[in-house]
Amino acid sequence: MDTLGWSCKGKQMKLLSTLCLFLILMVEEVSCSMRLHKLSEFHAKLQQRVAYSPKEDLAMPGPNGAKKGGRVFYPVGYGGDPAGTRESSEAILSALSDAFQVQSKQQMLPGVSDLGGVVIDLQGGTYLVSKPIRLPASGGGNVVIEGGTLLASETFPSDRHLVELWSPNSPGANDQSTSYPKMVENVGIYYEDITFRDILLDSSFRGGGIYVVDSARIRITDCFFLHFTTEGILVKRGHETLISGCFLGQHSTVGGDPGERNFTGTAIDLQSNDNAITDVVIFSAAVGIVLRGQANMVTGVHCYNKATFFGGIGILVKLAGLSQTRLDNCYMDYTGIIMEDPVQVHVTNGFFLGDASIVLKSINGQVSGLNVVNNMFAGDPQHMNPIVALDGQFPNVNQVVVDSNNANGMSLRSTVGKLTVKGNGTKWVADFSSILLFPNQINHFQYSFYSQGETEFLKHAVTNVSNNVVVVESETAVNAIVSVVVDQYSTPGEVI
């Protein structure tokens, strides 16, 4: 019985060992299978990365030099020369024409077809163009044009722009001058969500860079504009054109150019509303930025386009009486800001170097809702130029604050003044004429009278406020300290 029991137990042990070995082999096989599956997935992803490698795209636009791959169109496939030796205008225009025919049933703004994010890929090439690259007149939206150089040929028309967005339905769109109405009125939108990215536009001293008319939500990002004679970027009507991370200059320079006094052209001209210019450098042009519309925002811009001494203007705010503009955190490098009858304009957190300043130019003599605060100014102490100056008379001034700025080598100007006058006598004169911005305008004043060594109350009063001078007099002679605070702030309708 014992022998039989041991025999049964032995068989059970062998069976159990065999079963365990089988299970171990099965687990290893499953684990191996999972590893192979993951390896296969990784290999597939790697092949996909290789298939869409930028180097592969640069080597060949598509299989056998195809014109497109998916929804990406290649001007090289249309006969464009990426080496920049042969004329490529027609190739790029053909690629654009085909891209604008890839339309979905979706619309963006009314009448603007959604093109589904089609891309015109310049593939890092340099393309010589003899005529403007004008987007199809049919209009459209959701398009990207990226990655290359457009170079104007010797025969490029000097009154046109390298890239143009305008429809024949836009009134006056073919007039690319900078004439403008008093009010910007939109008549229709034909292009929307068009993105220009990583493009160098070299106008070869013939015409301008990009011309945009009656378009909405256009992005010009990380682009370089060079050798323009009219405008680097000109926008008419429409709204919400975003210009960011761009460099613009008529001449290649990093400052101190011997030919600076001869710089011409305008880097950015916006005859449009609700636009933003962000993180942009303007290194050579007669005028850096012209703002002719309302509700525009300029922030983080460095202007050293042409020194004020040579007649240059950094930022020109036009549309007198309707400006509604914000200029924030800008670096005005030897070139300043001119504002025509500014209304609701905000200039803050800026740095003005090399006697760069702010000039208020009178058109109808109005300034309202102007804030110039928290800026730094640096200039030549031998000149001591004012940080803010007036060009003309301003009889209509209200809600203006120029304060909390600091200056080194320049004269502070403010709409708020504080002075302390000491003296032994009957009259104390606080002269604010070298401090206050507007002449002969003190809207509010306060004063305190401290008589030293006197125990009795003395009669004293303000006897005159004129020509930005406050006079305080006492009934009897006394050794006193008089502190006076004034401001030029008034609200509409306030009687002074």
Task: Report the location of each language-model feature.
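A structural signal for short secondary-structure junctions
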Residues: 319-321, 331, 341-343, 353, ...
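Small/polar residue-rich beta-strand/coil "junction" motifs that cap repeat-based extracellular fibers
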Residues: 47-65, 360-369, 373-413
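Right-handed parallel beta-helix
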Residues: 142-149, 190-203, 216-227, 239-257, ...
